[in-house]
Amino acid sequence: MTIESVPRSGFGYFIFGIKIALSPSIRKFVLLPLIANVLLVGGALFYIFSNLNTWIEGWIGALPSFLSWLSYILWPLLVLTVLATFSYFFSTLANFIAAPFNGLLAEKVEELLSGKKVNDDGLLDVLKDTPRILAREWRKLVYILPKAIGLFLLLLIPALGQTVAPFLWFIFTAWMLAIQYADYPFDNHKIKFDDMRNNLKQKQGKSYSFGALVSVFTTIPVLNLIVMPVAVCGATAMWVAEFKDQALRSRL
């Protein structure tokens, strides 16, 4: 049984992504996505922790008096929600900037796992393809933003925003992160965005669990600085094992 055909859970693919990112033939392709993530997410964390206490106290203060007893339960939930929201926003921005290099990383990981050449593009070819890659990133944002705005508005509703919204936001973030990172290997094969989403929906358990673990890691200081390249590697491993054969056949 080849390494890419070994069944894994969504969690397992993310953990496997760590091993792939550290492999000698992949490390050099990890560097540029890593730098982009460190700069943007690191700056975001500094801003978040400078203001977190003020934000949380404001939200807790908006609770009706008869729900004030929930404040001790809601504190950790709201902290996680704020961390996940801002980390997701800034990691999305980092992904947008690093998209060409994430695509190249996904290509090299697929070649490592499958032993087959994906294409003959070098760095110059990747740079030439940047407009198309950024258009794909924009397509993702068009899909994500209306839903994110709706959930953000839900956060502002007293009581409902402090109780239900954090759980909905976590589920939403898990799905969006699965789409964000799985899209790189799909896009390397020019598979349409809607077709990519439909493929992920066919294996929602693995897609959601992969995205959920990525979401958790994006909220952990220091570890969240390495999430981007690891998630690209893990999502590409999931593509090779779970989606590649069917997706390429259906494209014919």
Curated annotation (Swiss-Prot):
GO terms for molecular function: high-affinity sulfate:proton symporter activity. The chain crosses the membrane at residues 29-49, 66-86, 141-160, 164-186, 212-232. Its main location: membrane. GO terms for biological process: cysteine biosynthetic process; sulfate assimilation. It comes from the Bacteria. Keywords: Amino-acid biosynthesis, Cell inner membrane, Cell membrane, Cysteine biosynthesis, Membrane, Sulfate transport, Transmembrane, Transmembrane helix, Transport. GO terms for cellular component: plasma membrane. It is found in: Cell inner membrane. Pfam families: EI24. It is a multi-pass membrane protein. Belongs to the CysZ family. High affinity, high specificity proton-dependent sulfate transporter, which mediates sulfate uptake. Provides the sulfur source for the cysteine synthesis pathway. This is Sulfate transporter CysZ. The gene is cysZ.
